[in-house]
Regions:
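Bacterial N-terminal signal peptides that target proteins for export
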Residues: 1-9
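Bacterial N-terminal signal peptides
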Residues: 9-18
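Sec-dependent signal peptide cleavage junction
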Residues: 19-27
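Primary mode marks residue(s) on the alpha4-beta5-alpha5 output face of response regulator receiver
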Residues: 26-191
Length: 191
């Protein structure tokens, strides 16, 4: 008799678990879409790198690539935003470009906050619309203090996910120190 009642209870519990999982996945997809749309609206003018430099962004650390991972691209960083200890979806600390056909193309953004500034008033790592930031310790390749970061590939698809650090579809192939970025910037206006 007890087994007769056990099966319906198990089926009800499994159904509730499945519905909860679907609801959570749906909420996460909505948050992801909202964040990507926010990034696109906030950065559409920065497709022109001259607009980015006029807004306080500057070239930082060349083109970042990994041997197996793809690349992170060419970062233009606004130091005032990095140092403010705040996260604002409409004001990313870094804009990510890639040189394609001799032009700088906006491919994504990176939100960055110095860990010491964040940790002074928060107990958990930063999140933005449901996305948890990654921690990068020091020392690091950028020669900056430990920081939290979140990439958003809003302008170029990333088959590994829109919030992963590395994008196999981004390349540093056309990048050479100095002149390639300067020449690409001169030809990037209006795309």
């Amino acid at each position: 008799m007890k087994r007769k009642f056990l099966l319906p209870v198990v089926l009800i519990l499994l159904s509730l678990f499945a519905l909860t999982t679907v609801a959570l996945a749906s909420t996460n997809n909505v948050q992801q879409g909202t964040l990507v749309n926010t990034v696109r609206n906030a950065t559409k003018n920065f497709k022109d790198v001259d607009a980015a430099t006029s807004a306080g962004y500057g070239l930082f650390h060349g083109c970042v690539s990994g041997p197996q991972e793809g690349a992170m691209g060419i970062h233009y960083v606004n130091g005032d935003l990095v140092g403010d200890g705040e996260i604002d979806a409409s004001h990313p600390e870094a804009l990510i470009y890639e040189i394609r056909d001799g032009r700088l193309r906006l491919v994504g953004v990176e939100y960055v906050v110095i860990a010491e500034a964040w940790d002074a008033s928060h107990e958990m790592p930063p999140t933005l619309m449901g996305q948890v930031f990654h921690y990068a310790g020091a020392p690091n390749r950028y020669k900056i203090p430990a920081f939290y970061e979140l990439h958003v590939w809003a302008w170029k698809e990333n088959p590994n996910g829109m919030f992963t650090d590395w994008n196999p579809k981004v390349s540093c192939e056309e990048y050479t120190e100095g002149t390639a970025v300067e020449n690409a910037a001169e030809h990037s206006s209006g795309h």
